[in-house]
Amino acid sequence: MYTGRFAPSPTGLLHIGSLLTAVASYADARAHGGKWLIRMEDLDPPREMPGAASHILHTLEAFGFEWDGEVAYQSRRYALYEETLCRLKTAGLVYPCHCSRKDWQAGARRGADGFVYNGRCRHPGQRPALQGKQPAWRIRVPDRIIGFSDGIVGGYAQNLARDIGDFVLLRADGYWAYQLAVVADDAEQGVTHIVRGQDLLVSTPRQIYLQQCLDVPTPQYAHLPLLTNAQGQKWSKQTLAPALDLNRREQLLRQVFRYLKLPEAPETDRPAELLDWAVAHWDMDKVPKHAVTAP
């Protein structure tokens, strides 16, 4: 059975880009007769906005979304992540990293998603002294291509050794890294389809590699076009994207429908009816492959 999900982070309030992802993931799930889950990705408490999680849920309800089951909170799932890391330790796939970011980034080359880790701590004899600090934990990556067929973008691939390097699963400050948490959650929740923004496309080969290491199914992925402002920047909390105005729910839904190339919806003042209409007319093949300007 199709199981999709929407996984916001409570570092801020929902904005127009969030709404596009919510609509697309919801419409794709419901159009396939599937489930749509909500998962709150609250992995980084220092960056979270107080009250954002409850505000996000209230906003989704106000826009007519109905999800299946209880909301999952990553902050309550640490035991699952610890179990997942233990499996990788047992398989000999991970190692402690004693490097500070400043140390390992000095002289490092840039890859697909920031600097490529140079593998300094792969070999025990080369690891610097801990000096009383906890290590991060990294996973060894293979020198081979990992690719997949995306439902919107098409073919996408990376050589993890060349483009990414061994990446962190547990940070030195004790917080779980996104890549491990999302793979563990998707597997445990039975997620079969992931519809999300293209800013996460670069993360997908890492997640597929983790799925292979853990012998869990790889979901089908579809990465949506990013919404950009007039300066070509992705609308996000960092670019001061305005929070969704609950007094303009119908207008904002229609705006998102246009970005997703849905036909014009009939007049109604009920957001839930607009969502039902989007489900009935959903066509992933019409979704643009490239960024869309949303002034």
Swiss-Prot record:
Single Gene Ontology MF annotation: ATP binding
Cysteine disulfide links: none
InterPro entries listed in its UniProt record: Glu-Q_tRNA(Asp)_Synthase, Glu/Gln-tRNA-synth, Glu/Gln-tRNA-synth_Ib_cat-dom, GluQ/Sye, Rossmann-like_a/b/a_fold
Any Pfam family hit: tRNA-synt_1c
Necessary cofactors: Zn(2+)
Its biological purpose: Catalyzes the tRNA-independent activation of glutamate in presence of ATP and the subsequent transfer of glutamate onto a tRNA(Asp). Glutamate is transferred on the 2-amino-5-(4,5-dihydroxy-2-cyclopenten-1-yl) moiety of the queuosine in the wobble position of the QUC anticodon.
Originating gene: gluQ
Span of the signal peptide: none
Matches recorded under NCBIfam families: PRK05710.1-3, queuosine_YadB
Annotated SUPFAM superfamilies: Nucleotidylyl transferase (SSF52374)
Span of the annotated motif 'KMSKS' region: 234-238
Family: Belongs to the class-I aminoacyl-tRNA synthetase family. GluQ subfamily.
The name this protein goes by in its record: Glutamyl-Q tRNA(Asp) synthetase
